Every structure is written in structure tokens, then in C-alpha cells.
From Swiss-Prot:
Transmembrane intervals: 2-22, 51-71, 84-104, 131-151, 153-173
Name of the protein in its database record: Tic20 family protein Ycf60
InterPro entries according to UniProt: Tic20
Keywords: Chloroplast, Membrane, Plastid, Transmembrane, Transmembrane helix
Localization annotation: Plastid, Chloroplast membrane
UniProt family annotation: Belongs to the Tic20 family.
Topology versus the membrane: Multi-pass membrane protein
Superkingdom of source: Eukaryota
GO CC, alphabetical: chloroplast membrane
A Pfam entry, by short name: TIC20
Length: 203
């Protein structure tokens, strides 16, 4: 219970902390819309802030797909899932409003062109991309749950579930690695949609 409570507090405050951190860092960071030299000039603090929003599609993917297939994985992966991911996933599932609040907070505070604060392009890009991955996971999760239970627990259904989980997990991992490197990920369709939304993007 203490772990769940701690995670809940951290999750609810993470956007507030990120916003304050960005505001303070803005005084010392020169925002450069030409991102050709992003890898060398983007500070570590900016890179770390840009990966925080990916918790949203991660837990959505775990809720819709991961919880059904992870318990059947090799023994070595089960303790990691049960001790670290499962308690946080239970908290996320029991507080559905959390995902919705995070969704709108990310969009209105970090993504919008008329955002109340000035945000680095790398943070805006990854925030928008995490929102799209969240929507993709939610959509496919709703479609999967619409099928009869007989299909969902069948071999084919679990195979589809497994494929969707690894698709979401791999895209999130790829995006986080790129963000830590100070680079922009290039996920087909999704990243292109982000480029359309985020003005001033430059590879």
C-alpha cells in the first residue's frame, strides 16, 4: 500500500514538477529551433523530461495487452513484472481518471502552439508522440475487448495480444532511447503526424 500511495503521489505531481523544472531551466537554456545539432546541445535535463510522458502509453499497453501475456513469460521476467510493474499497473487501472488528466495536461501545457510556457522542441515532440501512442493503444485495446471472450483467450487471440503488446513496448523503448540521445524518433505514420502538429520541427 505504501508503494502504491508513493507512486500515486509521484504520478500526480510529475507534470507539475516537470513544468517547474522547465520554467527554471528556460532561464539558462537557449532554445534553438534549428535542431540539426540537437545531439550535442540538448541538455540532459531536457532529454530526461522528454521521456516522462511515455509512462502513459506504457501503462495503457500493459492494461490492454500486457497483463494477459506477461504472466506466461519465462520465470525470470515474472518477479520484475509482479514486484515493479504490477503494483503500478493496479494503481493506474483503479484510477482511470489519471490517464485522462495526464492526456489533457500534456496537450494543453506542453504540446499546444499556444502553450502557457515555452517548451523545448524535443519535449513537445515526445509529449505529442506519447499522446498518439496512448490513443493507438486505447483504440486497439477497445477493439480487442470487443471480441468474444472465447477468441481473446484462444491461441490466436493471445498471439494478437502478444503482438500488440510488443509493438507498443518496442515503439516506446525506441522513442525513449532516441530522446535520451537527444534525437527525434521516426515511427511510420505516428512520427509524421507529430511533425504536422509540432511546428518548427527539423530533422
Amino acid at each position: 500500500m505504501i508503494r502504491l500511495f508513493t507512486f500515486g503521489i509521484i504520478t500526480m505531481l510529475v507534470l507539475v514538477i516537470a513544468r517547474l523544472a522547465i520554467q527554471r531551466a528556460y532561464k539558462y537554456i537557449t532554445l534553438n529551433t534549428n535542431i540539426n545539432t540537437t545531439e550535442s546541445k540538448t541538455r540532459l535535463s531536457i532529454r530526461l523530461v522528454s521521456i516522462i510522458p511515455y509512462y502513459l502509453p506504457l501503462f495503457e499497453g500493459l492494461q490492454n495487452f500486457g497483463q494477459y501475456v506477461l504472466p506466461d513469460y519465462p520465470v525470470g521476467a515474472i518477479p520484475l513484472y509482479k514486484k515493479i510493474l504490477l503494483p503500478m499497473l493496479i494503481f493506474y487501472m483503479n484510477h482511470a481518471i489519471l490517464g485522462l488528466v495526464t492526456f489533457f495536461a500534456l496537450y494543453y501545457v506542453l504540446v499546444r502552439n499556444k502553450s502557457p510556457i515555452t517548451v523545448h522542441q524535443l519535449v513537445r515532440f515526445n509529449s505529442m508522440q506519447s499522446i498518439l501512442l496512448f490513443l493507438v493503444g486505447s483504440l486497439f485495446g477497445a477493439i480487442f475487448r470487443a471480441f468474444p471472450i472465447e477468441f481473446r483467450i484462444s491461441f490466436i487471440g493471445l498471439t494478437v495480444c502478444n503482438m500488440m503488446f510488443w509493438f507498443i513496448l518496442s515503439t516506446i523503448t525506441y522513442s525513449i532511447v532516441k530522446a535520451i540521445q537527444g534525437k527525434y524518433s521516426n515511427i511510420p505514420v505516428i512520427s509524421e503526424a507529430v511533425r504536422i502538429q509540432i511546428s518548427g520541427y527539423n530533422t
